[in-house]
Amino acid sequence: MSAVFTALAALVAKGDRLVSSRGLFGSCFVIVDEILPRWGVETVLVDGPDLDQWRAALSEPTAAVFFETPSNPMQELVDIAAVSELAHAAGAQVVVDNVFGTPVFSRPLEHGADIVVYSATKHIDGQGRVLGGAILGPQEYIDGPVKNLIRHTGPSLSPFNAWVLLKGLETMDLRVRR
């Protein structure tokens, strides 16, 4: 959850607007529906597969867009390219939680997303040995606000847990395909 929270907190501030799909893992939903609004971020929720709802919600300036595809637990699919196009027209950065898509089957950055987050605990580790996450995005984003949040709020892996994740990556392709 640290990856999702850090990725979003690095993009939005008090007075900003976030548009998110409703179809989210429970803790992700709490971040966008309860935690960020307490800090003055306006959150607008839409049904992920419904492009008309995205279009309507993105008719106003927006700082960020967030969705999972496939979503957890409903496995709803969001059109990454279409939502990214709408979001960019509204001035928003697109954050995709690709935990179920995995980098084996889905590469959101190739379809217009700006930032991708993963729960490393699931498919990257594959064994449930490590709690962790990953954030992928432009170097200036990672080196700037993401690094600042990680350094000062603590969601970083130990060297051993990073090594365990590397071991999981060695077999991830085989595991997710079978």
Describe the role of every protein-language-model region.
Residues 1-178:
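Conserved PLP-enzyme active-site core in the AAT-like
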